[in-house]
Amino acid sequence: MIRLRTYAGLSFMATLAVIYHAFSSRGQFYPATVYLSTSKISLVLLLNMCLVLMLSLWHLVKFVFLGSLREAEVERLNEQAWRELMEILFAITIFRQDFSSGFLPLVVTLLLIKALHWLAQKRVEYIETTPSVSKLSHFRIVSFMGFLLLVDSLFMYSSIRHLIQSRQASVSLFFSFEYMILATTTVAIFVKYVFYVTDMLMDGQWEKKPVYTFYLELIRDLLHLSMYICFFFVIFMNYGVPLHLLRELYETFRNFQIRVSDYLRYRKITSNMNDRFPDATPEELTASDATCIICREEMTNAKKLICGHLFHVHCLRSWLERQQTCPTCRALVVPPENATSAAPGQRELHQGSQQGTSSSGNQGSEISSSAGVSNNSLSRHHARLQAAASAASVYGKSMVYPSANTVAWSSGVPGTEQVSTEPDQTLPQHNLPVENSHAYANMSETKLEEMRKSLETHLEILRNRLHFLETRKPESAGEPENKGKSVADAAE
């Protein structure tokens, strides 16, 4: 504000100096005015003084209707001002044929009026969230919105009248469209404020307020989208692509699309709330905190969500108008369609798991029995290996193997082979864990297979030698023969 005063003072002194110079040098009124309108320096200083007057008037209106601005309002003003300034510069490039000295004051006036609309919207939002507001604040905000609506209507009427008189597209088309948007915005803000006052007079018990507010915003976005589309095509047909409208057109379309989707989802949820959300039982109200987290009041009747939290019916309905998540745990009130389609399968899976717990004993017994069968077969395999190893050990200790030159098979016996006449054929030695059966369980299958083949070779050699002993010494080897046969048969 201090910088504005300094700037205004310097501008005022410069304007007085140039006016004094014009009248002192020309001596008459008409030549002095011609000089002021033709001299570039004089014209710039006069336009600068007009800008200072408009800024001073803007601050006066702000002080009368709003008073001092809050920090959030100043931030909103700074953010929106730079964005609107860039859009107005783009608009100037489109309407460059109509650019003149009278065009700049109109553009600055439009920017300042837009700034007042931003402040009005932000102040109404602040009043709606403030518990206690003075009557003076209500009177000032109502008067401010009435003043803005009057200004919008006057400028819109002036622009439309100029269009009708000229009957051709000009910069008045741009101003008429902008003030039409501002007028509808002012009406929407005022109606929203009326909803707030009505709800306040009803002690916050007006259940239809969120519904009406939602419809109001939906209609406002629809009107803005329609006007943006019409203005876009009019400018495109007469001037070219309106670059300054692309962002506003996209944002308006996006907001309208979101509101329509929210509305359809809200109608889908609230159409069958009684069927979708069951009533909470007295036991559930007693077991949980019987305080509605939305309105912070005690609950005697409540609706239960899928997640298990309880809320008032009207509180839940008003909450679902803004978002479709639980206020407590942020879970979706209605799961997505893919989740709902997968839910029966999950329930069947859950039921199957419950049924599976009852039959888990039988299944476990079957698994254990099958495991027991495999363990029994493995135990029998180990037993055969142990028996073969025992037989090899018995025969290795009890038998005196004949020398190689005495071991000769009869050539007349079919299917027999001639034993080699090399030096004594000894059995390969293996460290077989005969006593410890757990040692076989720790061995790999390859190792067990090698051991089995080795023991089969041993048994074959033992059978041949046993047959040789039976043919040579039947009387003396009777008892060992029977013992060897029984052990060998057990090993097989």
Curated annotation (Swiss-Prot):
Residues 25-40, 120-135, 192-221 are lumenal. The keyword Zinc applies. One of its GO terms (molecular function) is transferase activity. Residues 470-486 have a biased composition (Basic and acidic residues). It comes from the Eukaryota. It is an enzyme of class 2 (transferase). PROSITE patterns: ZF_RING_2. It is found in: Endoplasmic reticulum membrane. Its main location: endoplasmic reticulum. It holds the Pfam family zf-RING_2. Belongs to the HRD1 family. This is ERAD-associated E3 ubiquitin-protein ligase HRD1A. It comes from Arabidopsis thaliana (Mouse-ear cress).
